[in-house]
Amino acid sequence: FSGTQKKTAEKFSKEIAYLDKFCWKIEQKYGFTMSELEYGPGIAVPYFKDQEDTLEADIKVIKTAISGMKWKGKVMLEMGRAFVASCGYYLTCVHECKKNNDRNYCIVDGGMHQIQYDGQIRGMYQPKCRMYPDGREGKKEKWTICGALCTANDVLVRDIELTAPGEGSVIIFENAGAYAMTEGMSLFLSHELPAV
């Protein structure tokens, strides 16, 4: 494992070249042949709106770099977040909607203690999420979704466009399958954990 959320494929090539040189050196200098190498590349997950999904391109770069290794042992990839992020969703219910100084707010029963994306700070980046039921009648407006904690930091999303959210509406956060719940402070103030 050499890091997480890497933004450039060039890092994978450099790391694999370094590992190749290291494995080859151990074999040549000490006569010890490693049969396996496990590599956790740290492929980035596009958690937020307008982030590009580079998974396929990154895997091609990694495959090419591994194929070109001088060391010929077995390489296993620990794919971590890159493969499991899309396997989970976080659902939270709207408990109250209000307006303050021309800004719309949805207060939900969850919060930052239950969902936390790598790089998310007070809703500054918009995670991929939607409302259920969708297709309500009304005007599409910008909303700020705030959690249930008594802190101004508990902002999950700012300026998301929703049509007529109300009490009981469900906000569905995507890409919650890897660390999104465990990176939060789940038991903060003895709040219940979300159901799995």
Name each model-derived stretch:
Residues 74-196:
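Charged (often Lys/Glu-rich) extended helix/loop segments that serve as interaction or gating elements
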Residues 1-98, 162, 188:
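Active-site loop/helix belt of alpha/beta enzymes
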